[in-house]
Swiss-Prot record:
SMART domains: S4. Catalyzes the attachment of tyrosine to tRNA(Tyr) in a two-step reaction: tyrosine is first activated by ATP to form Tyr-AMP and then transferred to the acceptor end of tRNA(Tyr). This is Tyrosine--tRNA ligase. A motif ('HIGH' region) lies at residues 39-48.
């Protein structure tokens, strides 16, 4: 199957500048293309993964990727469809984020092997040395204010206000495309659908300044239930950094995908063939309660992002927590599986009677409720049901001398630390 057709069948093409011309270019030989990643945090997130994996698919098809990390544009901030202006970061902060993101990209693109091995670039290398006068004379003169204000991303900010700094962002992104075309013969840019205005600024600059044709592919944005884009500035991000979103949390994210989205996400986020995905779809629709599509999705993406061992650990944590087998997990695994649950620091001189601890830790509101819960068998300490009102937590209940896991009912977990 032609790579362009595969991208379409996977639902990875939202818009293109000229489908026929792009298809022809991809058929005739190796195409050099780039995707830009602005360092707005110390990690990329799930929203970036769509473009990253699309870039990887093109590389596997023989084309050459350039990964641009925006050391310069990250200092400015992209206004595209943001409700408010981004906070400006120091250069030292952005430089640190650039290094982190470059390391993450190395997990997905091959920077070592073959004539189409990926190349990492940083746009600070060309923006850092350009003067303001040269910027206006050599780049700015090719953009009319009318053209710039016609972009949807700008229109949405005109009423609330947009700084010149952010207004000029599209020129900077356009110049990125121009530089990569001149220096590396890059003719295709890939990005999120919210980037269409910035990306076509690049094709316009190529046309006017160099009389060349550039191509653009936008990939669909992944949205939450409210229709908002997954990304740091909108909250609820699923990060690719395991310190920010653990492999277990990422596993749970995919396991909780709605049935209506599961097969679509298999096409977008995995490298399973379309035939394999079709077989999974048939099995899934025949027995949706078994959640096969979600299980495969969680396995494939967690393995892709964090490795097979991290996937196995996430699966084990899931199974043991579901069964209530707390003691079968290490403290490291428990911290991963119970990240975000209520936590209470037990004081050295605090009485460790179960009833009193349930109240002092905030697990229940009163001693009466605590006694009822214990007597009714609703309280578990490290997976063991406790029904003795006089039970006192001892050192034996401190897992690896660090924590105790309290469960109230079937699913409400609490962690006591020492």
């Amino acid at each position: 199957m032609h790579i362009f057709d595969e991208l379409k069948d996977r639902g990875l093409i939202f818009q293109t500048t000229d489908e026929e011309a792009l298809r022809k270019a991809l058929e005739e030989g190796q195409v050099s293309y780039y995707t830009g990643y602005d360092p707005t945090a110390d990690s990329l997130h799930l929203g970036h993964l769509v473009a990253i994996l699309t870039s990887r698919r093109l590389q596997l098809a023989g084309h050459k990727p350039y990964a641009l990390v925006g050391g310069a544009t990250g200092l400015i901030g992209d206004p595209s469809f943001k409700d408010a202006e981004r906070s400006l970061q120091t250069k030292d902060t952005v430089d640190g984020w650039v290094k982190s993101i470059q390391g993450q990209l190395s997990r997905f693109l091959d920077f070592e092997n073959g004539e189409n091995k990926a190349v990492m670039v940083n746009n600070y290398d060309w923006f850092g040395s350009i003067s303001f006068i040269d910027f206006l004379r050599d780049i700015g003169k090719y953009f009319t204010v009318n053209y710039m204000m016609s972009k949807e991303s700008v229109k949405k900010r005109i009423e609330t206000g947009i700084s010149y700094t952010e207004f000029a962002y599209q020129i900077m992104q356009g110049y990125d495309f121009f530089v990569l075309n001149q220096d590396h013969n890059v003719t295709l840019q890939i990005g999120g659908s919210d980037q269409w205005g910035n990306m076509t600024a690049g094709t316009e600059l190529l046309r006017r300044k160099a009389d060349k044709t550039g191509h653009v592919i936008t990939v669909p944005l992944i949205t939450d239930a409210t229709g908002k884009k997954f990304g740091k500035s909108e909250g609820n991000a699923v990060w690719l950094n395991p310190e920010k979103t653990s492999p277990y949390e990422m596993y749970q994210f995919w396991m909780n995908v709605m049935d209506a989205d599961a097969v679509r996400f298999l096409k977008i986020f995995t490298f399973l063939s379309l035939d394999e995905i079709e077989d999974i779809r048939k099995q899934f629709e025949a027995a949706p309660h078994e959640r096969l599509a979600q299980k495969v999705l969680a396995r494939e993406v967690v393995t892709l992002v964090h490795g097979e061992e991290a996937y196995k650990e996430a699966l084990n944590i899931t199974e043991q927590l579901f069964a209530g087998n707390i003691k079968n997990l290490s403290v490291k695994e428990l911290k991963q599986g119970l990240r975000g649950v209520p936590n209470y620091q037990v004081q050295a001189d605090e009485h460790n009677n179960i009833v009193e601890l349930l109240v002092s830790s905030g697990i229940v509101n009163s001693k009466r409720q605590a006694r009822e819960d214990v007597q009714n068998g609703a309280i578990y300490v490290n997976g063991d049901r406790i029904q003795d009102l006089d039970y006192v937590l001892s050192d034996a209940d401190k897992l690896e001398n660090e924590l105790t896991v309290i469960r109230r009912g079937k699913k409400k977990y609490f962690v006591l630390t020492y």
